[in-house]
């Protein structure tokens, strides 16, 4: 098992406030899942299985709790068999998202969904992601560029701007490239709690109890402030019937 996964697992076990935030993520994912087979890409430390025990968990790296080791750009899934593909913090690590979307479109049944929670680059979050978070933000990148995936590429290479670019600047182009897919939802959420937890770092500036209260307040603010200040976006992409 890769060393970063060990570090993430340790943080997950030691930080109840981290679990509070991710349970909010999982509540959002579960609320929009279609009935049927659900496949997780980027299963990582396996925490989604605690909420969705029947999910088929995959990752590009081996871990004993995973059901399958697979690259998101070359999925071993039969055509038209999957109801949901769910991912947390995965899209911005994929080398060629266009290849990924074609793979998932092939595997989804009509009405099936890709449900992704990702970093949101907004007026309120940009300084945090650019100056504090360790992963790059390249807004000038082409998130839908074509190419052949490199099997030797570091799976932790990333561009945190990719999900925001697909949801905004490249949305019309996405529709042209993938006429069988539609971006059905782009929910902009999460303001203070996520950065205050420190993520998978050993520190946190907020308690679990306070995090729960602030999360409730944040949900009330999402309709008015989400697009301006959110730190997260949930994209729901649906395969047309």
PLM regions and their residue ranges:
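Conserved class I S-adenosyl-L-methionine
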Residues: 114-150
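Short alpha-helix
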Residues: 162-186
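A short glycine-rich, Lys/Arg-flanked "PGG" loop and its adjoining helix->strand segment in the class I
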Residues: 99-113
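C-terminal lobe and adjacent flexible extensions of AdoMet/dcAdoMet transferase-like proteins
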Residues: 196-205, 210-241
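Conserved N-terminal segment of class I S-adenosyl-L-methionine
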Residues: 1-73
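Short conserved loop adjoining the S-adenosyl-L-methionine
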Residues: 74-79
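A conserved beta-strand element that flanks and buttresses the S-adenosyl-L-methionine
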Residues: 86
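Short catalytic micro-motifs in class I SAM-dependent methyltransferases
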Residues: 89-90
């Amino acid at each position: 098992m890769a060393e970063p996964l060990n570090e993430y697992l340790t943080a997950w076990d030691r930080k109840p406030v981290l679990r509070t935030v991710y349970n909010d993520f999982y509540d959002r994912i579960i609320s929009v899942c279609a009935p049927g087979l659900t496949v997780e890409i980027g299963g990582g430390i396996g925490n989604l299985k605690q909420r969705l025990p029947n999910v088929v968990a995959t990752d590009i790296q081996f871990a004993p709790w995973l059901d399958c080791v697979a690259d998101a750009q070359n999925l071993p899934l039969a055509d038209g068999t999957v109801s949901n593909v769910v991912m947390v913090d995965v899209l911005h690590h994929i080398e060629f998202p266009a290849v990924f979307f074609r793979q998932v479109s092939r595997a989804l049944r009509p009405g099936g969904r890709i449900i992704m929670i990702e970093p949101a680059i907004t007026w309120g979050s940009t300084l945090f992601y650019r100056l504090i978070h360790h992963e790059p933000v390249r807004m000038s990148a082409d998130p839908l560029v074509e190419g052949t995936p490199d099997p030797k590429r570091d799976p932790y290479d990333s561009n945190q701007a990719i999900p925001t670019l697909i949801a905004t600047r490249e949305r019309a182009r996405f529709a042209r490239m993938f006429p069988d897919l539609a971006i059905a939802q782009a929910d902009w959420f999460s303001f203070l709690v996520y950065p205050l937890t420190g993520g998978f770092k050993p520190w946190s500036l907020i308690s679990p109890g306070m995090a729960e209260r602030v999360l409730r307040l944040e949900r009330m603010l999402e309709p008015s402030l989400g697009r301006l200040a959110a730190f997260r976006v949930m994209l729901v992409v649906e395969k047309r019937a």
